Curated annotation (Swiss-Prot):
Name used for this protein in its record: Thioredoxin reductase-like selenoprotein T homolog CG3887
Similarity-based family: Belongs to the SelWTH family. SELT subfamily.
Pfam families, per the entry: Rdx (PF10262)
Keywords: Disulfide bond, NADP, Oxidoreductase, Redox-active center, Signal
One record GO biological process: cell redox homeostasis
Length: 198
């Protein structure tokens, strides 16, 4: 078996990062499902900041809407932060994993760069568990700070009806019910024409 050298480990880490980037890029190219042939019912979508702890609020609204409007389909998901923050958080995640793997495998990235190994890196090598825990928690803190948007966005049939980012507050159930009633009042069901030739 070939001995693992620093160069081989670096190539392995590079391949893992490239694979992660390819998987990430493939996930964005999904084609949305069309609504043709489906029973079209009103659909309410909640996009919320998962790292802010708004999932519980989403579940409460789902329960309220299920009682009052059982015909409405309710979907929910994470609100991805706009702009550069999302990509920076992904880069911090990859960097965190690379550093932890380097510490655990006792590979010094400074030797690849032709630099002397700093004393703090040697200290990390001597205290691997402590160093890995600190890297993990600091990385998570930075990621959470970058992706926490404070969003709680509500759309009904792809029409925005409430934005916590704009109003600064959650809608009360009464306000949400009034918005839904007003929206459903204007949407009329398509009546089949008996004279239409099929």
């Amino acid at each position: 078996m070939e001995r693992l050298t620093g160069r081989n480990v670096a190539l392995l880490v590079l391949c893992l990062c490239a694979g992660y980037a390819l998987v990430f890029a493939e996930g964005e190219k999904e084609i949305p499902v069309t609504k043709f042939g489906q029973n079209i019912a009103p659909t309410m979508t909640f996009l919320y900041c998962y790292s802010c702890g708004y999932r519980k609020a989403f579940e409460d609204y789902v329960g309220l809407l299920g009682e009052k409007y059982p015909q409405i389909q309710v979907n929910g998901g994470n609100y991805d932060p706009p702009g550069l923050n999302y990509y920076l958080s992904k880069m911090i995640f990859a960097l965190k994993i690379i550093i932890i793997v380097s510490v655990v495998s006792a590979v010094s990235p400074f030797t690849f760069l032709g630099l002397n190994t700093p004393s703090w890196w040697s200290h990390m090598q001597a205290n691997k568990i402590y160093a890995c825990m600190m890297i993990f928690f600091l990385g998570n803190m930075l990621e959470a700070q970058l992706i926490s948007s404070g969003a709680f966005e509500i759309t009904l049939n792809d029409v925005p009806v409430w934005s916590k980012l704009q109003t600064g507050r959650f809608p009360s159930p009464e306000v949400l019910f009034q918005i839904i009633d007003n929206h459903l009042q204007f949407t009329e069901k398509v009546q089949e024409n008996p004279d239409f030739v099929k």
